[in-house]
């Protein structure tokens, strides 16, 4: 198990958010301010040390060795937000329709985290039934469809299940489909709505190789900011950090915390090819 301590003074930007139909936030009106939210350090203690208002779950899994490197609160559920897009994409692939126009749509949905494309595919393919199908296909243990069928971002998911999703992609998907999805996990610097999604894994492995899916939303009732993906030249490790953080820290503060956590999670990993 790993422990996480959050303690430092950083300058952040409070961002007023609007909610889309799927539960993923769109940034508006940045307002400069300062608050005590922190860059994070992660230690190898047996307990998690976090302020009460911050929830965090992490997991690092070595696909080559078939074991966890570290994990903390990996069975705690969080709102998946844009991580649901991974299920939309894998469900589309399983149906044999990851071709033609759908290739471009999935690329936009994953790399630029385009909510409008996700809305369209979610509605067209049965909404919550997508989650149900992928839970069965991947053997997910704690992923639950949203209560409101129109809000795909309200799907709940654990860090352990995120690991299982990436395991499925890397070990069970046909090679052609896997390569398509990996090429789409590019996490462009800015999302389709203009949000800066260069945080977490993409900051933690700036000179290495990563394939990442980020997620964020506000304000129901707090900031949900997640970073997930594969790191290492041969996609050896799955790295997951899920968080729920106070509104006062703003988006910049929340991403700074997640980036600090991600940097420590990958610090001891061998990211070179065998």
Which sequence ranges carry the predicted segments?
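Penicillin-recognizing serine hydrolase domain
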Residues: 2-7, 15, 21-31, 40-65, ...
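N-terminal, intrinsically disordered, polar/charged segments of Gram-positive cell-envelope systems
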Residues: 35-36
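Active-site SXXK
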Residues: 66, 76-100, 109, 239
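Second-shell loop/turn segments in exported
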Residues: 72-78, 95-96, 104-108, 116-124, ...
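A generic alpha-helix surface/boundary motif
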Residues: 86-87, 115-116, 129
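Buried hydrophobic packing segments
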Residues: 88-92, 121, 162-169
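Acidic/polar active-site rim loop that often engages polyanionic ligands
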Residues: 111-115, 162
């Amino acid at each position: 198990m790993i422990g996480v301590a959050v303690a430092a003074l950083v300058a952040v930007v409070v961002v007023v958010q609007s909610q889309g139909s799927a539960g993923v936030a769109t940034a508006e009106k940045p307002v400069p301010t300062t608050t005590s939210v922190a860059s994070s350090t992660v230690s190898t203690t047996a307990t998690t040390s976090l302020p009460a208002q911050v929830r965090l779950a992490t997991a690092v899994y070595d696909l080559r060795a078939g074991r966890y490197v570290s994990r903390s609160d990996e069975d705690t559920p969080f709102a998946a937000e844009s991580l649901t897009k991974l299920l939309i994409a894998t469900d589309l692939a399983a149906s044999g329709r990851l071709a033609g126009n759908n290739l471009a749509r999935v690329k936009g949905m994953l790399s630029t985290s385009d909510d409008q494309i996700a809305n369209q595919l979610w509605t067209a393919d049965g909404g919550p039934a997508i989650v149900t199908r992928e839970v069965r296909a991947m053997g997910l243990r704690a992923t639950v469809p949203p209560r409101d069928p129109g809000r795909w971002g309200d799907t709940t998911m654990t860090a352990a299940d995120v690991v299982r999703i990436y395991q499925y992609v890397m070990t069970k998907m046909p090679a052609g489909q896997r390569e398509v999805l990996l090429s789409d996990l590019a996490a462009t610097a800015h999302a389709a709505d203009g949000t800066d999604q260069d945080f977490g894994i993409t900051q933690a492995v700036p000179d290495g190789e990563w394939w990442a899916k980020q997620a964020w939303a506000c304000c129901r009732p707090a900031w949900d900011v997640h970073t997930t993906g594969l790191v290492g030249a041969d996609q050896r490790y799955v790295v997951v950090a899920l968080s729920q953080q106070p509104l006062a820290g703003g988006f910049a503060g929340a991403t700074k915390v997640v980036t600090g956590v991600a940097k420590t999670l990958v610090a001891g990993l061998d990211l070179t090819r065998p």
